[in-house]
Curated annotation (Swiss-Prot):
Binds 1 iron-sulfur cluster per subunit. Required for insertion of 4Fe-4S clusters for at least IspG. The lineage of its organism: Bacteria, Pseudomonadati, Pseudomonadota, Gammaproteobacteria, Lysobacterales. Its cofactor is iron-sulfur cluster. Gene3D superfamilies: HesB-like domain. This is Iron-sulfur cluster insertion protein ErpA. The keyword Repressor does not apply. NCBIfam families: iron-sulfur cluster assembly accessory protein (TIGR00049), PRK13623.1 (NF010147). Homodimer. Belongs to the HesB/IscA family. GO terms for biological process: iron-sulfur cluster assembly. GO terms for molecular function: 2 iron, 2 sulfur cluster binding; 4 iron, 4 sulfur cluster binding; iron ion binding. Iron-sulfur cluster binds at C56, C120, C122. It comes from the Bacteria.
Length: 128
């Protein structure tokens, strides 16, 4: 005799486009990106943040300028400056903040990521 078991259906994947701010792009970071874009002389540039394998903790953050926005990219605009994130990277960055800090030890873009279980001392790699 066989018994049919009804399995629960998977919840639909969250639609990050409908979330108000899945990622925070600080005013300080936007100001620095604006300055760098002006130095490049190309007003069509946006800052792309992405995640890739590597680093001492398993994943690392990457930053690059990009003129092209893919249809499924998340675009966060702060003070007229655009930050782009692809959907695969966004799953690791949900709720994170992209900021820019200056201190006696130097200036850098910083990602404060609530999803990171551990980070390394350099601040550019993490694990989940």
């Amino acid at each position: 005799m066989s018994t049919l078991v009804s399995l629960p259906t998977a919840a639909p994947a969250p639609d990050y486009q409908s979330i108000d701010r899945p990622l925070h792009f600080s005013v300080a970071a936007a100001a620095k990106v604006r300055e760098l874009i002006q130095e490049e002389g190309n007003a069509d540039l946006a800052l792309r943040v992405y995640i890739q394998g590597g680093g001492c903790s398993g994943f690392q953050y990457g930053f690059e300028f990009d003129e092209n926005r893919a249809e499924d990219d998340l675009a966060v605009v702060t003070d007229g400056v655009t930050l782009l994130v692809d959907p695969l990277s966004l799953q690791y960055l949900m709720g994170a903040e992209v900021d820019y800090t200056e201190s006696l030890t130097g200036a850098q873009f910083v990602i404060r990521n609530p999803n990171a279980k551990t980070t390394c001392g350099c601040g550019s790699s993490f694990s989940v």
